[in-house]
Curated annotation (Swiss-Prot):
UniProt xrefs under Pfam families: DnaJ, DnaJ_C, DnaJ_CXXCXGXG
Location of the J domain: 5-69
Binding site for Zn(2+) 2: 167, 170, 193, 196
Key words, A-Z: Chaperone, Cytoplasm, DNA replication, Metal-binding, Repeat, Stress response, Zinc, Zinc-finger
Gene Ontology cellular component list: cytoplasm
A Gene Ontology molecular function term of the record: zinc ion binding
Cofactor(s) required, per the database record: Zn(2+)
Record lineage: Bacteria, Bacillati, Bacillota, Bacilli, Bacillales
This protein's name: Chaperone protein DnaJ
Amino acid sequence: MAKRDYYEILGVSKNATKDEIKKAYRKLSKQYHPDVNKAPDAAEKFKEIKEAYEVLSDDEKRARYDRFGHADPNETFGGGGFQGGGFDFGGFSGFGGFEDIFETFFGAGPRRRASGPRKGADVEYMMTLTFEEAAFGKETEIEIPREETCDTCQGSGAKPGTSPTSCPHCHGSGQVTSEQATPFGRIVNRRTCPVCGGTGRYIPEKCPTCGGTGRVKRRKKIHVKIPAGVDDGQQLRVAGQGEPGVNGGPPGDLYIIFRVEPHEFFKRDGDDIYCEVPLSFAQAALGDEIEVPTLHGHVKLKIPAGTQTGTRFRLKGKGVPNVRGYGQGDQHVIVRVVTPTKLTEKQKQLLREFERLGGDTMHDGPHGRFFEKVKKAFKGEA
């Protein structure tokens, strides 16, 4: 089956920026993560989303994809040493698919033998953090389900006191040979042994604990240190804490994916924090000194007289620590001047007096040109 377009998978245009691609990935990865979404196809969709993001978030890979699509000439054919130009031959019909013809002639040679050492599978774990935990980091213990080597048989899969033997079907080679008539003549066909699955081993008496697999499912506690400054959708790799390797291969890795809960007051953009604070009309007009909450405690902020709504103030170094240790972000404070909606008669009278005494001062400064244009428009001078 042809692979879907990566841009279509993430739901972004081909001109999408890195930030747009990142936001789309975060949203979809949370929606389809197997730990959250129990739909039968969620794991496959999550894998598809992750693959698309890995390509489109890398400038070099994205450039190659934009030029060649899935038929990237840098890709190899069949996972082995044969250079196939990166083309998908799966749709070739007539002899059961182009890959089948190659396998018929050459057997399963290009593919990695099942009996060789292989790295264990990686494990993914979704962790929810509060806004503050993500900013400052924390140490915690998590419990993950994973497959581990069976203690009863020490991973051999055989009942204690017995041992695996050479597979009687393939005589320990892991492959079976047969002849086949094709339009090109009779050829020798080598395939993975269906009895031992390519391992070359046969287990006469299986281990009662693991049923012959050599592995059992367990839940393992792992102590992890979350660095300060992690953001929503980011991953932390814990090397060697995935599933055990196969046939002496190294263990896989653990990937912790972070979901950061939104904050009721702060918003985050990278290492910077944004917040809005209300000002009364009097505070904005006369100036004031107010207290602003930050992640590091309350700080005093001086509001100059004549401050307009939407004015932004920066509190240097009051943002989030950079997760890679490159300094600290800032906090941006945006003021909103609140217009009173319920006034007493006395307050209304004072405001009218204020307006009378103010004269045309409202039309001075940067807003004066705007009001002058409005005045001319009403007079037909514009």
